[in-house]
Amino acid sequence: MSLEEAQRTIRALGLCSGGLDSMLSALVLRDQGVHVEWINFETPFFSAAKARQAARATGVPLHVLEITDDYLAMLTAPRAGYGKNMNPCMDCHALMFRKAGEYMRAHGFDFLFSGEVLGQRPMSQTASSLRYVAKHSGFADAILRPLSALRLPETPMEQQGLVDRTRLLDLSGRSRKPQIALAAHYGITEYPAPAGGCLLTDRGYSRRLKDLMDHDAALLPGALHLLQHGRHMRLGPATKIIVGRTQQDNEQLARLYDPQQDLLLKTTGRPGPTVIMPGGGPREMVYLAAAICAGYSKAPETSTTAVQVTGAGRDDTISVLPVLPNEARRFLIT
């Protein structure tokens, strides 16, 4: 380290998931006098809510970037493939480090860090996975993993004296006992469970996403948010509907639907679900959607039911015989 570097504050930018490991990695570096800040990313698949909580708990400044466009470009064809569901963990982490590296370079930080622990996760935190992420981020020489540093090759930051390697840690494996002990040392009493908050690891959401990707090349954010709510049914190659399961579903569907191009269907005079048809559809599909809407309502099974159809320039009522849930099940996206 030069004299000039020794006299200035070293600045590090950390990727923060909001979990305990992220918090500890920042505090370990802050103990050395490094000025630490965090960066977190938002898409329709995950939010920065936990990272904001961690920032409040530790006083570490947090920057949140929205990266949906870049993420979708990666998600359609991840170089390392998907995990158990639609989760492209390795390419996701590489993208996040690349975006963090660009932010680091633009805002004068000295290096990047994360709370990753060698061997903690079987797919994304093996030694080969960490190397893959570093290589494909474009910032391999700027990434420090403080919690497992002593089990990994020495980084340029350590060689240059920007951080003291002897004060970094040698954690590895799936045991959480060392982290819990370290949390007690730092006075951290509240932190989320290590389970992730990414929708792409959810089996049901992933199936609905795969169906959307197979039938709609646009992948607009609104359609991605809709995947979280209701029963999704594929009526035809270009037509799907979403049927509310609960009152909360119904409220979310009514909030998220686009009245300029989507159709919203509800039974009139009887309790029933909110149904939306993204992008509308041909006449026969609208009638089928209305019949399914009636089938999930409190309407009599054997008589016609009035269903109001609004949106996409329409505001009218049609009468249909209900298609009952056991008949509609064949349309479910599973």
What residue spans do the PLM features occupy?
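AMP-forming adenylation/ATP pyrophosphatase catalytic core
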Residues: A142-T334
